[in-house]
Structures are given as C-alpha cells and as structure tokens.
Amino acid sequence: LAPILCFTSQEIWSYVPKMPGMKDYVVFEQMPEAKAAADEAFTAKWDRIMAIRDDVKKVLEQARADKTIGSSLEACLTLYCNKEVYDFLNTIPMDELADLFIVSKVDLTEGEGGVKGIVEGLGAAAAHAAGNKCLRCWKYEPAVGENGLCPRCAKVLGL
C-alpha cells in the first residue's frame, strides 16, 4: 500500500514492532517475494481470458463510435465461438463474464459471426441491452422493478 497510500502506510508502520534491520520509513523497505509459485494452468487461463477481453473491448469501442451504445454497461455482448472456445467460456458463469467485460449481458453462441479479433475461433458483436437501467449497478435489465432496481440489487439491499 505504501506507494499508493503513503501517509496511511507510514502511520500503520509506526505501530509495527521494530526488528533489527527494519527501516524507520515503510517506503524504504523492500517488497517481500511471493512464497508460492504461480500455477501455470491458472495463469494460462487468465491470459486467455484477458486476450478475449481485449477483443471484446475493441468491439465495444466500435459500437460506441457507431453510437449503438454510450457506455459499455449499455451493451449486450454476443460471443460467437467455435466448440473449444465455447466450452472454455461456458465454464465461467455468464454474470461473471458480464462483470469481467463490463457489459450488462453476455450471450454465448456456437458458430460463426461477429467481428473477428486476435483470439482464434471467436467473434463478437455488441448491441444495446434490453430493459431499463438499474439505479444502483447501472446495468440494463428487463426485470428492473418499480423501485428502479434489478433483482440482484434488490436482493442485496434486502428489498
């Protein structure tokens, strides 16, 4: 935290019991090295997800330039995938994919279509999401109630 919250970090540091060799100021300390090695499969999975996200961002930017959407949360994203990419993305819940891509909804479709990007076997298309804007999360949802909240936000707020 020291590079970002330097004053708060220094205040916390002043309460840490001092050991021989410790510096007076937290910003002069070295960062500890991670003890656990990175899981190769985990890293590969997230590298792939981020590559897909890069392709999605390009499609969203084009939709924004075409005035189809104003912000990415106004988008319903359709991903056209070959079988392998479809099976990979289908392991991730759709609401989590929507959060990852910062859109209101994600639809997976097996087959060809959409704008091709760097990721092999993937095409993407963006359209304006159906429904109304939730006042809390700003996602577009057909089931936004009279209180202006989507079912998820209403549940979180206990309404």
Language-model features: locations:
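A carboxyl-terminal module marker
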Residues: 116-118, 129-130, 152-155
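Flanking scaffold residues of small Cys/His-coordinated metal-binding clusters
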Residues: 129-132, 144-145
